[in-house]
């Protein structure tokens, strides 16, 4: 009886074990978000080919008009065609997000890398300053700096948003640099007389860029939201500069007249773009965590 049980235990069938199928290239990747984001960006870049009317023209005979065949997305309180404004203004919103992210990433990489290779006392000083800067509300800093710089324009607003959103990336860069600063290739580059920026570009950036990629993507999202928030509050770009944020600044008048499309359509495009960037950023973070867990 015992031998029979051992025979049964040893003769388990293995034919039913299904080999793991190969993972599809698109699985685990934000394909839909990337496709939607690319489509929105391309449409904004090709706005002149898509626009049905002049986005700056104020047709006072057709203000607050609901969507129809002539005005696909309706008109705003000043009679401007919202369909044309979406694509025309989207370029500026995306441009501000991109410029602000480039500025914040550059500052973060330089400050974080310098802190990572600096002596302990200087590293401590830089990190304490970074933490103090990080503790101040970002929106308050943006408003203060913009007030100092004067009237807002695309460049000044991008600069102000950029110089107030570098701290989180800088801390990650500093941590990564401190882990590799005593590597043989870094020491060899120093011995050969390479300067800080050459070592940073040639040796340090390739090692930590994947770790901050998701934060860079998230910064684009944050910059676009900041621009929209400032425009909504009436302290961003002038009303004649069309962006998704400036379109939303007319929401108070739209609510009074029941013109829901003035709020819904720009808000929908802004939220869709932000969600796509969020999904892409989360995918970058998961990819980075997966790579780090394999080591």
Residue ranges and their predicted role:
Residues 1-38, 279-295:
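Transmembrane alpha-helical segments of polytopic membrane transport and secretion proteins
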Residues 48-50, 96-130, 143:
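Transmembrane-helix boundary motif in ABC transporter permease subunits
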Residues 18-23, 53-101, 250-267:
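Periplasmic/extracellular loop-to-transmembrane helix junction in inner-membrane transport proteins
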Residues 164, 217-220, 259-295:
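C-terminal transmembrane helix and the adjacent membrane-cytosol boundary/short C-terminal tail
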Residues 72, 76, 116-117, 122-179, ...:
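Generic hydrophobic transmembrane alpha-helix motif, especially the helices
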Residues 147-149, 177, 226-265, 269:
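Glycine-rich helix-loop "coupling/hinge" segments at transmembrane-helix boundaries
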Residues 34-46, 98, 102-110, 114, ...:
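Generic alpha-helical transmembrane segments of integral inner-membrane proteins
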